[in-house]
Amino acid sequence: ITGDTTGAIIGALKDHLIKTIVGRDVDDFEELIQAVNRCIVKNTSAKAAVDMALYDLYGQLYKLPVYKLFGGSRRKVVTDITISVNDPQVMAEDTRNAVERGYDTIKVKVGMNPDLDLARLTAVRQAAGPERQIRIDANQAWSPKQAVRLLNQMQEKGLGIELVEQPVPAHDFEGLKFVTQRSYVPVLADESVFSPEDAVKIMQ
């Protein structure tokens, strides 16, 4: 997804990122984070490793876990379970098993075959029942117009899709905007966001 390799990550760490932070005061936290982002372009995997290490050090400095540094902590985190792509009846059985294990949110991969996707989602919805959430991940497979058409079909069939993840190619920010403005299904960007700058661009 990122295009990074293990060698490239190690190189970015040794040649740029570690040299940028070694010997500096972790209490100067905001400047450290900015320096990490400025010292080399891209290389988001290596930057993420340093970012996490700096937050951990900052928490140790003030004897606080990182979740308390961020604020808004919670004792329970809701996650989903991905139902592997298979025949609709197999996916329905997998969904029933997931529900029995306590999952309230089901994730389904879509994008390769619209008719089969609808059959799979229908089976998953019937197995999950009306009270549980179903979210889908198209993995950049659709064009903007195709995404709107298919999402509208899903809504018309009463599938109750909670959100769609990355419906269009990662670079197509205008396409994400197009889908967001024309579909009732909320759009989640995934591969489109690899940096704080990407996040700002998405929000704009």
Ranges and model annotations:
Residues 31-32, 68-72, 109:
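Beta-strand segments within the central parallel beta-sheet cores of soluble alpha/beta enzyme folds
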Residues 97-109:
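Catalytic domains of carbohydrate-active enzymes, especially glycoside hydrolases
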Residues 55, 65-68, 91-96:
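Short, charged beta->alpha transition segments
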Residues 83-92, 97, 114, 118:
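Active-site beta->alpha loop and helix N-cap motifs at the rims of alpha/beta catalytic domains
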Residues 27-29, 66-69, 161-167:
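Flexible, glycine/charged-enriched surface loops at secondary-structure junctions
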Residues 60-87, 184:
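N-terminal small/glycine-rich loop or linker at the start of catalytic domains
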Residues 108-204:
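Catalytic core of soluble alpha/beta enzymes
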